């Protein structure tokens, strides 16, 4: 039987247990002493800001190190193209799934809420920002930073990714003459990852602050009005993860449950903070540790954070149909097709916009005249709770995408990956922040199909 001393010792070594404890204490604090709990918000916000502070640098280091040592630049372009095609297929499946589930269940039907009962002021906060969602040309132009420094200063990950790909490609082409620069960036990455390791140790505190504030602010009762929407959303995400992503992962030779267990610490942090940004560096590190080549991880994960938002895609079509039903708006087949086509465009602008879920939901509703935009206010009270499901599904989707594309490219050491997922090889033992050396990532350089 485990003694208290043994449990404390185990907790001191396990970020996962520390995060669970932080989450439980946060709920207790939020319910028991809400006045104090609402003041804990800076702990969660501060933790996420600390993580975001290093994301651009980590993406730069991982991508440059990966591409500069990748050898064949045609392979890098091939990975990028395959990633975009994969993302488009999977997000389309997610959008269709959300649409079909909401429509077939009649989600929200019978509520009989009249438009004049809805407070327009809250809606205006989000509809007034729909101009932030750009068209395809403006989006592509937005990938090009005004300067290298502005990309890093504004923490625009896609702009940083573009510069990193160009910089890494140039290092690759210059070759031996630039070996000193490549070595310097590699050594710099050790420092950045060490800082990240220090920050990750604060995860339990960040989760405690975020959960305590949310429980005190919204309360468990806030789910009661829109419980059906929340439950159907989570059930749909679960079906998508286990059936769709599970099948994709299985085709790559990996089982979903061991895969989820491998990322349990990161999933717990996302559950507490409702932000997948908070674990991006750790996830990239763990995927490399599984045996995936760093250049593949560095290209797929940052791109996926903007183009492969499976959880958000489910939420978008589910919420649009729910609002239509709850306001008594009849939907013809042409309306459903319009919702799907509009969502395919608007869903690609979600990452990087504050309050992006509600802003893009407003943009989608605005583009579908049959549905009243005022219905947006109906999902405001449960948006945070649904945000947890969005972030979890987005994260799992991007991890699965990385494994799948690495498998297509023979960029994964499968014996090593299976050994780690089966528990025969240990996962990174602690958040020490050390980047993984190439030999540790790819089985001394030998990759297996």
Swiss-Prot record:
Pfam families linked: SDF
Transmembrane spans: 14-34, 47-67, 83-103, 157-177, 195-215, 226-246, 312-332, 359-379, 385-405
Superkingdom, natural source: Bacteria
Membrane topology designation: Multi-pass membrane protein
Keywords: Cell inner membrane, Cell membrane, Membrane, Symport, Transmembrane, Transmembrane helix, Transport
GO-annotated cellular components: plasma membrane
GO BP terms: L-aspartate transmembrane transport
Subcellular location: Cell inner membrane
Gene3D superfamilies reported for this sequence: Sodium:dicarboxylate symporter (1.10.3860.10)
Keyword Nucleotide-binding: no
GO molecular function, one term: fumarate transmembrane transporter activity
HAMAP family on file: C4_dicarb_transport (MF_01300)
Family: Belongs to the dicarboxylate/amino acid:cation symporter (DAACS) (TC 2.A.23) family.
Function statement: Responsible for the transport of dicarboxylates such as succinate, fumarate, and malate from the periplasm across the membrane.
Protein name as annotated: C4-dicarboxylate transport protein 1
